[in-house]
Amino acid sequence: LLSFNAGANDVLRPNYNPAKTLEEYRQAVKVLSGTGATLLLFTAIENVDGTGKVAEMWRERFSEYNENVRACAKSCGAILAEAKRAPFLSDKRFLHTDRLHLNAEGHRRFAQGVLEVLELPHDESWDIPLPPADRKPFFQEKSENAKWIISFVIPWIWRRLRGRSSGDGRSAKHSEPVKW
């Protein structure tokens, strides 16, 4: 089994080139499927509590990206782990503080969904949504948004202006495999 998840960060970039990114993804899947391994491909979450033009643009981009992943999976007989099978993951409480990636519980639950797709033992309650969240007080929400802008948005813009990638100089979160 060979799992492959790539290209989603490219979708977020201001200079995103769908033709290039989607073709590179297709070529990578073609090479990987040539290994004889069973491929496991992943779609991305399309809708995370966002409104406005940027949120709509990302939804459209991720929809197109996901259609490409589905077509690739179909063409090579890959197993597909569909993020849309877990709509509860669009709940912000499953996101890391960067608001882009899943947090530990989001990853744990999605991993259980992957085990289900693979027809392996898994936690049957992996896809149960959290109870509705209490509305945060106005100033708490604004404070959290300001912290997010200072901690993630401004550094991202600064890296982009200097031609650096967000992955430059970063190491893995876990140096050893993590067992759930």
Give residue spans per PLM region:
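Ligand-binding pocket scaffold of soluble enzyme catalytic domains
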Residues: L2-N5, L40-F42, L80
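Short, solvent-exposed loop/turn segments at secondary-structure junctions
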Residues: V11-R13, V48-E56, S90
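Alpha-helix N-cap and loop-to-helix initiation/capping positions
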Residues: Y16-E24, E56-E64, D98-G106
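Alpha-helical scaffolding segments of alpha/beta enzyme cores, especially the outer helices
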Residues: K20-G34, E64-A71
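Substrate-gating cap/lid alpha-helix
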Residues: D49-A83, A104
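Conserved catalytic region of serine esterases and O-acyltransferases that act on ester linkages
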Residues: S75, D98-R99, E105-W180
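A short helix->loop->beta-strand "cap" motif at the edges of active sites that frequently abuts
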Residues: S33-T38, A78
